[in-house]
Amino acid sequence: MIDVKQQINAVRRQVGTRVLEAGEARTVTVSQSYAAPIEDVWDACTNPERIPRWFLPISGDLRVGGRYQLEGNAGGTIERCDPPSGFAATWEFGDQVSWIEVRLTAEPGARTLLALEHIAHVDDEQWAEYGPGAVGIGWDMGLVGLAVHLSSGRTVDQRESATWTASADGREFMSLASDRWYDASVAAGTAPAGARAAADRTTAAYTGTGS
């Protein structure tokens, strides 16, 4: 489906904090440069007919103030839309509410840098247990679909994606991504021993290899 190591190396991962009205929140950010003009990347990320071609089926009213729902996943409210430079929305799953911000930047050579920041209130116990990879690996997987779609123009079949995720390549990808989230966690100030233990638990949860 994709060159595992090439995709792992193509993504930059960052961990941080942000102060919101309700208090301090954790942030995880993934960013990747694509060989596609900004208008094409914007369309891939906002067109309801195109989003399912690389991510998940989506329904709702995709405009500021409108509600969206990803099939079998999160929903939320679109809070800001600045075409083609970015958008922001709530990310609601069950009784948990967090936020996403997507930023697009045109680069030389008709390329585009996409950065996605996920902002969430996470209690210290949960963060210590699984670290940033609990959310970050999921976004890594999403960027795989976008990379395939933008580079080839083809639709990423959901069954093909599920089969790849369960394959040796898919498990290797998640393990390597978890290691990179360990690096990002340590760079953000987490003690290496704690970050390593959290990354190992997250790897086991994603790959089904046990703890």
Where are these regions (language model features)?
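Short strand-connecting beta-turns/loops that link adjacent beta-strands
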Residues: P83-P84, G94-Q96, E107-R111
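Vicinal oxygen chelate
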Residues: S59, G86, E92-G94, S98, ...
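Hydrophobic alpha-helical segments that drive targeting, anchoring, or assembly
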Residues: Q32-Y34, Q69-L70, A74-T77, T90-F93, ...
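Ligand-binding pocket scaffold of soluble enzyme catalytic domains
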Residues: F87, Q96, R103, A115-E117
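Hydrophobic pocket/interface hotspot
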Residues: V41-W42, I51, I78, F87-A89, ...
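Terminal "cap-and-tail" regions of soluble proteins that handle hydrophobic small molecules
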Residues: M1-E21, I119-S211
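Short beta-edge strand/loop motif at the mouth of beta-sheet-based domains
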Residues: E21-G23, T29-V30, A36, D40, ...
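Hydrophobic/aromatic beta-strand elements that line small-molecule binding cavities or substrate pockets
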Residues: Q32, G76-E79, W99-A106
